């Protein structure tokens, strides 16, 4: 007589499988972050797993085509390192925006960022480093506080007050510097202005000595798909940011009206 699996047993297997998936993704993340081949022990130490467990995960990733071995070292395959096809909307947006970003950087000096909105997440799609001695570092995952960053304000301006409340939590909002807007009414009033005018600023609100200005990239539906941002030391902003704003708005208008990548991004995001 056939044995019918118990509900508890099926749930336990699902939990085990999801745990293995999370550990495998963590291993891939460490390989990407290292930017060099890693030994089994290096990977195991970095993810906090026993070498035997890590070895089984790497074998599974190898069989699935996500890692390969170079002697005793492990490396990500092209499938893992470059998962997006060349014609993916994010890659198309990067290519369409690159000449405009270089022109903005050369004209004004600060770094230029192209940021995409994926739900309530922000991703740096491309960057052009500014003209200053300290090389800036921009992570793919944008973690700057929503209420104290240009990309965050543009994203929040695209949300309802109720959605903003869920994203920000209760006021007063955390202070990053003495210039951070912490009051709910003051911040929401600024966000409404950002929505109307299409651009946002950060004047020493996240890091003292760093300012930024940026404009939204807009889907045909009117929703924001991302932002273009000029950011750098406050000395670039001593004479104000109107010239930067004007050029950013022109660049965004050009992309919004002519770039098929912006339309493709709106389809990709479902907005």
Each predicted region: which residue ranges?
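A short beta-strand signature within small-molecule sensing/ligand-binding domains used
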Residues: 208-216
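Juxtadomain coupling helices with adjacent low-complexity linkers
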Residues: 197, 208, 225-271
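Flexible loop/coil segments at beta-strand boundaries within sensory signal-transduction domains
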Residues: 218-224
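Amphipathic alpha-helical effector-binding/dimerization core
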Residues: 76-170
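Short loop/turn motifs at secondary-structure junctions and domain boundaries
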Residues: 106-107, 204-209
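Amphipathic alpha-helical regulatory segments at dimerization interfaces
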Residues: 30, 95-107, 113, 193, ...
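N-terminal helix-turn-helix
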Residues: 2-91, 253, 257-261
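Short, solvent-exposed recognition segments
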Residues: 2-5, 134-206
